[in-house]
Amino acid sequence: VDEFLNIHVPGHQIPDLLGKVPTDTDAIIMPWRLYGNNERVAIDDVSVTEQFIRCIPAEAQYPVAASLFKTLFRAKGPFNQLGVHRPKQKDPDKAGWPKMVDGSGQPVHPFLAKTPQRLSLYDLGVARDLVELNHYAVRSAAAFVVKRDRGLPNRATKKVDLAYWVERNFNTETDTSISATAPTRDRELATLKSDPRLAELHEAAVDWRRKRFELLMQHEPFRALFGRLLMAPPSRPVTPQAAAFMIRHANLARQSAPQKG
């Protein structure tokens, strides 16, 4: 698991979050927060949210991965089905446009609600006062090598390489706000691990990942990648001016691209 809901409302549960947004809300946009490897190398059997506590600045909009979001939505809203980042929307002529709020509970820009293919918050601002989604895309160097071997579940053709690492390995700030849920997390994990079969499966999964890493290190491409990960410094956020420059050109390229259909 590399995504964890980080609710900043007292109570830190989904019902607490829902109590802070308008009752007619169809969807809540939850911005990603990219967490880096925190200089960890090995595959350790420690909670992800405890191991990796350094991340990109909250206001960052570049690279594009820093501006992506996931969506918490009402099942009875104007949607057809699940999507990776946002649900598939119904025909607005029949169902209307969804009422969406941002991570601070404020209405999103109409463009976002009316552009179902839009998956990023480029130029739309990032709001995370109530909720955000901690995204641990790289984790430790060894874990990343295993991820490279596995690939991405929903984008089989996307390369998991050094460029992928550089665009996500931000360790600029320390943010431990998700630790507010640690007591509940630890209690639930203890309950799960009290089941002998689940405990056995957990140990087997950790053991498999460690052995898989050792096996991959016998092959030059994976060994070379691991070495480069160790040499690569943490990624440095670009300045707001540089981000604006890159976003402007991305928008220009999108506008000039041939329309599908």
Model-assigned labels for residue ranges:
Residues 7-232:
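Catalytic-site signature of metal-activated, phosphate-bearing donor transferases
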Residues 2-5:
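Acidic metal-phosphate-binding loop of nucleotide-sugar-dependent transferases
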Residues 220-261:
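C-terminal non-catalytic accessory extensions
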